[in-house]
Amino acid sequence: MGSSLSNLNDGTNGLAMGPGLGDIPESCVACVFMYLTPPEICNLAGLNRSFRGAASSDSVWEKKLPENYQDLLDLLPPERYHSLSKKDIFAVLSRPIPFDDDNKEVWIDRVTGRVCMAISARGMSITGIEDRRYWNWIPTEESRFHVVAYLQQIWWFEVDGTVRFHLPPGVYSLSFRIHLGRFTKRLGRRVCHFELTHGWDLKPVRFSLSTSDGQEASCEYYLDDVERNEALGKHKRGYWIEYRVGEFIVNGSEPSTEIQWSMKQIDCTHSKGGLCVDSVFINPIGDVKEHKRKAVLKEA
């Protein structure tokens, strides 16, 4: 059994077993790797010399990088990526790259190679953020940006943001990351406080997004309804929740796409408070052709 596995991997136990994986030309292995994900390629790299060589090939990793990868590299100092192989460039870009005064981050997904983005609460416009009677900035390790905006109490609740970026063609979703209640650490344990959490069960919060080419999406959510949530087994208080606003399509005809978003509850008949705003995420969810195909099938 051990002899057979050795021959399968190396093709060097040459008495009678015939060709093995080690006899496959590196160029052929590279062609197969074009259809595999980066984690799959890395897992197979240890099989033998041909697989290891193909797993480091620039031609393989060039296909895994997004078409705008040079735009991402331009956000870094040249010495970070100068003379790197395409595989190493992929590794660099799969880690978050901060920009816009470190209030935004962009990176590529390690499996799909598609571009993802996050925007901190500090990178958005928040009504009343300068007044500590309404808002406070709370440092925390629970945010990728290490700080969240905490609302104590306000009547006019509005959070807006915008970003312009060269996104590769594809279908993207936008979502807000929100937390009901204030959280702290006590004796190493996470403790949540809800004394100021109120007003989110009276009227829904309206979420919206729009793009520079005219796409729009909107939705409404009640952020807090303790009795209903408990009945359904959905516990929102004390947890980070991602509220999906909608989808938009980038066709690639424009050099860059501007995305605008907002989260509002501006009914001033009641106050609301006890809410943490962390960030907005823009994530790829598919390619344009597949999206159009599903739309056609749905209409049929």
Swiss-Prot record:
Any one GO molecular function term: carbohydrate binding
InterPro entries given in the database record: F-box-like_dom_sf, F-box_dom, PP2-like
Record-annotated F-box domain positions: 17-63
Protein name in UniProt: F-box protein PP2-A15
Lineage summary: Eukaryota, Viridiplantae, Streptophyta, Embryophyta, Tracheophyta
Signal peptide: none
